[in-house]
Amino acid sequence: MPSKRFKQLPEKTKDLTADVIENLLATVKKNCTTKFDESIDLSFQVNNKQKKGEVNIRTVVNLPGGTGKKVKVAVVCEDTKAKEAKDAGADIVGSDEFIDKIKAGELNFEKLICTPGMMVKLSKLGKVLGPKGLMPNPKLGSVSEDIKQAVTNAKSGQAEIRNDKDGNIGVSIGKKSFHDDQLLKNFHAILDTLEKEKGNLTLKGDLIKNTFITSSMGVSYKVKLGKAI
């Protein structure tokens, strides 16, 4: 039986469009009636059925409004770069001894960054890091000589954009407690990233078929982007 809170939500859960995203964000936040700080999420349907094979997107976006989450960042680097990593805010910094701990299953971090030189050693730990989604990836900015920038990006707020086998992408733009300006900046940063991805692909038609916005426990609204991506 539907709860009292659910009954108070709008009846339509789809096909509600908005030309002005600011108005839609206000509506989504208004429907966040639970006691916890609900996440505001975007979902995209990708036009991934192409004659030349499926479209696979995997990239990362730096969210100017942040994510509202504290990320524990670990860095595997040469000793000469250890201070740079610590000064940038890395929670754990190490080299060969740290790699041995990772091999033993000590994965007390949420993001792993390394230098290209150390990636050769970490690549042998695919069975340990891969299933947890922790293997550093140059395309995602987690393999870099510029350790300071990589750590800063990870700490300030990043989101991975990746479609599943059915062509769906899910990504959070923040929390109910965020100011509208934070959510807007994150929203547009994600769209800009998808637009760049489209430019790197050979497509027939648009990359994105449909876009929806919702909160953790709210209804889903269809977003009219105003431009084709």
UniProtKB/Swiss-Prot annotation:
Q: Name one GO cellular component term.
A: large ribosomal subunit
Keywords for this protein = Repressor, Ribonucleoprotein, Ribosomal protein, RNA-binding, rRNA-binding, Translation regulation, tRNA-binding
Quote the InterPro entries the UniProt record gives. Ribosom_uL1_bac-type, Ribosomal_uL1, Ribosomal_uL1-like, Ribosomal_uL1/biogenesis, Ribosomal_uL1_3-a/b-sand, Ribosomal_uL1_CS
Q: Which SUPFAM superfamilies match?
A: Ribosomal protein L1
Q: Output one GO BP term.
A: regulation of translation
- Say which domain of life the source belongs to: Bacteria
Give one GO term, molecular function aspect: tRNA binding
| Record-stated family | Belongs to the universal ribosomal protein uL1 family.
Quaternary structure and interacting proteins, as annotated:
Part of the 50S ribosomal subunit.
Cited function: Binds directly to 23S rRNA. The L1 stalk is quite mobile in the ribosome, and is involved in E site tRNA release.
Which protein are we looking at? Large ribosomal subunit protein uL1
Query: Which organism does this sequence originate in?
Result: Pelagibacter ubique (strain HTCC1062)
Q: What is the lineage of its organism?
A: Bacteria, Pseudomonadati, Pseudomonadota, Alphaproteobacteria, Candidatus Pelagibacterales
> In the UniProt record, what gene is named as encoding this protein?
rplA
